[in-house]
Structures are given as C-alpha cells and as structure tokens.
Amino acid sequence: MPRPKLIETPAERKIRLQDMILLRACRNVLGISQRELAQRIGVHFTTIAKAESGHSRLIPAKMEALKAIYRHAGLVFLVGSDGVIRLEIGPKVVEMIAADLAELYPVKAIRVTV
C-alpha cells in the first residue's frame, strides 16, 4: 500500500525547497558525492538524492548533522528574514575552490572577504 502524501503549508514547502538548495550547493562546493555525504551522516544515499530533488526531507537530527559537517568545512548558510539565502565561505573552502574559480572567472571578477 503506498504511503499517503503529506500535505504541506506554503511555509513548509519553502523550508523544504531551501533545504534542497542548501544540501546540493554545499555538497557541490565541497566536491563530495551523495554516497559519501550519506555515509557521514548515517543514511542511505537515496535519502540524500530524494532530499536534494525535493521529494522528501531529512529528519531534523540529520539536517543538523549535515549543517555541522558543512560548518566544520567552513560553509555557513544564512537564511535572512527577507528569505534571501547567503553563503559564508571560510578560508579552507576558498583555498579548495580558488583554482576552479580562477578558471571560470577573470581574477578581477572575484571578490573574497574573510
């Protein structure tokens, strides 16, 4: 028997979509696979895939585990009261992605504040 679909409010949908964007963005910035991320927090990789595609949400404890991994790596996402998502990148991450950024953008187009 299929599970019933959950009905979500517009606010809950917005949170789920923000989570999806944050999950994928952080994982891509760090250059890790869905499998590796899943192993780190103790879930199956399809759980990460479903969360990133917006088909499901991670339980709060697993989201906190992900946020802790990202914070430790130097990534902090802030969702403002205006709904704008801002990314703070620590020096470790800047070093990791500096070469990729240099290939994609002219040097004068990159502004890094630490």
Predicted regions and their residues:
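A short, Lys/Arg-rich alpha-helix, primarily the initiator
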Residues: 3-28
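Recognition helices and adjacent regulatory flanks at domain boundaries
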Residues: 5, 10-12, 34, 77-81
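DNA major-groove recognition helix of helix-turn-helix/homeodomain DNA-binding modules
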Residues: 6, 60-78
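Conserved hydrophobic/aromatic packing and binding residues within compact polymer-binding modules
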Residues: 23, 34-38, 48-51
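Residues within the alpha-helical elements of helix-turn-helix
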Residues: 29, 40
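Short glycine/serine/threonine/alanine-rich loop segments
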Residues: 32, 43, 75
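Recognition helix of helix-turn-helix/homeodomain-like DNA-binding domains
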Residues: 42-58
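Helix-turn-helix/homeodomain-like alpha-helical modules used for DNA recognition
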Residues: 75-114
